[in-house]
Amino acid sequence: MAMNYNAKDEVDGGPPCPPGGTAKTRRPDNTAFKQQRLPAWQPILTAGTVLPTFFIIGLIFIPIGIGIFVTSNNIREIEIDYTGTDPSSPCNKCLSPNVTPCVCTINFTLEQSFEGNVFMYYGLSNFYQNHRRYVKSRDDGQLNGDPSALLNPSKECEPYRRNEDKPIAPCGAIANSMFNDTLELFQVGNASDLTPIPLKKKGIAWWTDKNVKFRNPPGTDPLEERFKGTTKPVNWVKPVYMLDSDEDNNGFINEDFIVWMRTAALPTFRKLYRLIERKNDLHPTLPAGRYYLNITYNYPVHSFDGRKRMILSTISWMGGKNPFLGIAYITIGSISFLLGVVLLVINHKYRNSSNTADITI
């Protein structure tokens, strides 16, 4: 049965109540919350409150920015591009697919000594690790040592889930594209003799990743037996249980592998490769002078117009070299201070005009 609509009924709270019934109404309860009568506080912006705020922000941000900028500039850093696209580059020969394995050497000079611990990174450009399908192409259960996931990886790993009718360990596009160049550093002596620089490969991964997120399959058997029934990723030269002779750095807990599996947010990124620890407080870790970078060139980047580089860097209390943060603080502080000055002049000018007008009237 149709019902007649009456706007007056809605305004009054509904149709008339039948005799003996209870009135129905849509009117909100008469409370402070539902009737929007809650007490409110609204600041009144005056010159006396706004101007000091601008000046305080400027006086705080500018010194902080200068301190961060100076600290960043004191960090020693050098980048060596070894992509090899330049015909004069020693690594240009490695772009040919017929030269395998390819070893090239780049010599460079440190103009200043590197003090303290030195961090060696590898850097890649135009590599989009943040692609949605790429980021999801992994099986965290398998990487955590789950035996069922080891033999039956997640479908997210497709098309790198199975190969030769065997499950791939580790599966997925991230693991399949793992960086596999080998970098070695040598110091050139006075008689042109080469002194190898010790590169530490443990301690480069996050503690939580090494001890919680990544684990080998459980058991007391040799690692090869625990990975029995699986096969290596398509692009790998050797299986995961042969990544290192050190049992504490082999399999899924290999730190080079763990570092690579932490995907980057931007297409140009760097990842920690090795540590160069300081052993003697009387001598710099890397003295100024000539060095050789020996590269076993395996990782192809030419197909996607990428670039490869090696970075040597020290760190400070704020991390690695990052001048942007200091510049940002200085810029914001300067703009705030300048706005304070401009508003102070405007306030002074028009306040005097207002007072004069009042007197004239």
Swiss-Prot record:
Result, substituting residue 109 to A: Reduces ATP8A2 protein abundance. No effect on interaction with ATP8A2, ATPase activity or flippase activity
Subcellular localization: Membrane; Golgi apparatus; Cytoplasmic vesicle, Secretory vesicle membrane; Apical cell membrane
Modified residues (N-acetylalanine): 2
Topological category with respect to the lipid bilayer: Multi-pass membrane protein
GO biological process, one term: phospholipid translocation
Tissue: Expressed in photoreceptor cells; detected in retina outer segment and other retinal layers (at protein level).
Record region (Interaction with ATP8A2): 49-348
Subunit relationships: Component of various P4-ATPase flippase complexes which consists of a catalytic alpha subunit and an accessory beta subunit. Interacts with ATP8A1 to form a flippase complex; this complex forms an intermediate phosphoenzyme. Interacts with ATP8A2 to form a flippase complex. ATP8B1:TMEM30A and ATP8B2:TMEM30A flippase complexes have been shown to form intermediate phosphoenzymes in vitro. Interacts with alpha subunits ATP8A1, ATP8B1, ATP8B2, ATP8B4, ATP10A, ATP10B, ATP10D, ATP11A, ATP11B and ATP11C.
Biological role stated in the UniProt entry: Accessory component of a P4-ATPase flippase complex which catalyzes the hydrolysis of ATP coupled to the transport of aminophospholipids from the outer to the inner leaflet of various membranes and ensures the maintenance of asymmetric distribution of phospholipids. Phospholipid translocation also seems to be implicated in vesicle formation and in uptake of lipid signaling molecules. The beta subunit may assist in binding of the phospholipid substrate. Required for the proper folding, assembly and ER to Golgi exit of the ATP8A2:TMEM30A flippase complex.
Domain comment (free text): The N-terminal domain seems to play a role in the reaction cycle of the catalytic subunit such as ATP8A2.
Protein name as it appears in the record: Cell cycle control protein 50A
The species this protein was found in: Bos taurus (Bovine)
Upper taxonomic lineage: Eukaryota, Metazoa, Chordata, Craniata, Vertebrata
Name of the coding gene: TMEM30A
